[in-house]
Amino acid sequence: MPSFYRNDGFTLIELIVVIALVAVLAAVVAPNLLGKASDANRKSAVIQLEKIASSVELYRLETGRYPEQLEDLVKRPTGVERWNGPYVRKLSLLKDPWGNDLVLRRPGENGPFEIVSYGGDGRPGGEGDDADILNWE
C-alpha cells in the first residue's frame, strides 16, 4: 500500500543549529538597532527644543514677556495683551520623543529661560538615554 505521507523533515540537531544561529544574529543586531533608536530620540529632542525655544522668543517679542508655562504657547493665557498665537500648534508637541512633558524653567542657568527634556526616564539627571537635554546645549 503506497504512503501519501513523507517522513522527510528536520532533525533535532538541525533545528538546534538554526535556533542557535538566529539567537547569535539577534544578539549581534539588536543592540545596534536599539542604539540607533536612542540616538534618533535624542536628536529629535534637540531639534524639538530648538523649535520651541524659537516659539518662546517669538512669544516674548509679541507680548513683551516670556510665557509662564509652555502651555501658554498653545492657548492664550488670561491677561496677556498682543498674544498672536498659537506659537505651537498643539499641546502634544510639548512632549519629548519619549512622551514626557517638556519643562520651561525661568530663569534658566544660561539665560532668561531654558526648556528641558528629562530624557527617557522622565526624571532629572540620568545618563545615556535618560540624560537631560536642554535647549542651549
Regions found by a protein language model. Give the residues of each.
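Short amphipathic alpha-helical interaction patches enriched in hydrophobic/aromatic residues
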Residues: 29-33, 37, 56, 60
